Amino acid sequence: MPISKVYARSVYDSRGNPTVEVELTTEKGTFRSIVPSGASTGVHEALELRDGDKSKWLGKGVLTAVSNVNNIIAPALVKANVDVTNQQQVDDLLLSLDGTANKSKLGANAILGVSLAASKAGAAAKNVPLYQHLADLAGAKTQPFVLPVPFLNVLNGGSHAGGALALQEFMIAPTGAETFAEALRMGSEVYHNLKSLTKKRYGASAGNVGDEGGVAPNIQTAEEALDLIVDAIKAAGYEGKIDIGLDCASSEFYKDGKYDLDFKNPESDPSKWLSGPQLADLYHELVKKYPIVSIEDPFAEDDWEAWSHFYKTAGVQIVADDLTVTNPVRIATAIEKKAADALLLKVNQIGSLSESIKAANDSFAANWGVMVSHRSGETEDTFIADLVVGLRTGQIKTGAPARSERLAKLNQLLRIEEELGSNAIFAGKKFHNGNQL
């Protein structure tokens, strides 16, 4: 089924920044996709094209990317008469129009918007749900489908929040649930308990939420944050059923080969900065003391030695985000160096659906886990909910169970689970091996 029209416009993300929306039309109708954007972005990511005109949107406009869709991509895609169900052909055309390694000519935000809208049109052309079409494209098993464990970011630190806390995300993972719906209820109840406890201990304003819906109290250390979360889990009555995940985003506090856990203090004392092995010891202590099952970006994006050293003895899932930025070349290096055992999959880091699927399949081939992820600047687009089910990864992180741009994905997963009925299983404790269930 050919594409008759492609049109892009500038809309806004959850932080009030401009982002690209693409509408792609076939005889089945018009299909829309909105591109997200990140706050802590890896240096090896595909390029998100921003206008840089400081007189508009403080330099963050995306009119160039929008114009690239409307004036370069749209005519080429319509003229090429590609079948919208052939995602690889669509993406190959987009990549050839750009011609750069990091999509800097047209912008990853322009290319991705078209790529994702095409996949929605492809599903409609086949009269199947989007997750089924994505499973077909990935060659994934669909008997049964796997619903993911939601890693819910309930407490924020690092670059996502004020306060001295260096680590960026503290997530709860309801691995002891029987279904996705039950997991989300458990997560929601813990979240509300956490909000009440936080306000009690840190004052009413501590209940205010960060970019991803988590609370951001003025907490100094990781232990303090983890104690608060464990207390909330106990208060909700789910001890032993809810585990914890961390996203350290360590590249944000890596300075001169050391890790500065006091990086938000301009007067930080360099004699207290930690070496890679010292930071690894801190993680080991946390894993011993708390029900932590997953640690993302424990070290900086080019500190390969620290990653490999820690992975040998970690004993929990080690997720690579800034290290790999969903890039097949970086993933291959991480696999070879035994630096991690799970990929954080962000479609806008690599900038096309076909490349994202390849990144996931490369990871599965090495017995890695894959966690599908939102970005901190999100929208009402629910694509990643279908993606996590289609790819069968068994784990997703899409913020707290609060703020509509986060709930949009979680609610879509509720719908998918209901629609699949007995052809759905919940990943639960086996979230790391979702694709093998």
Swiss-Prot record:
Keywords, ordered alphabetically: Cytoplasm, Glycolysis, Lyase, Magnesium, Metal-binding
E.C. numbers: 4.2.1.11
Annotated Gene3D superfamilies: Enolase-like C-terminal domain, Enolase-like, N-terminal domain
Details of cofactor binding: Mg(2+) is required for catalysis and for stabilizing the dimer.
Record SMART domains: Enolase_C, Enolase_N
An example Gene Ontology biological process: glycolytic process
Record has Magnesium as a keyword: yes
Similarity comment: Belongs to the enolase family.
Protein name, UniProt field: Enolase
Gene transcribed to yield this protein: ENO
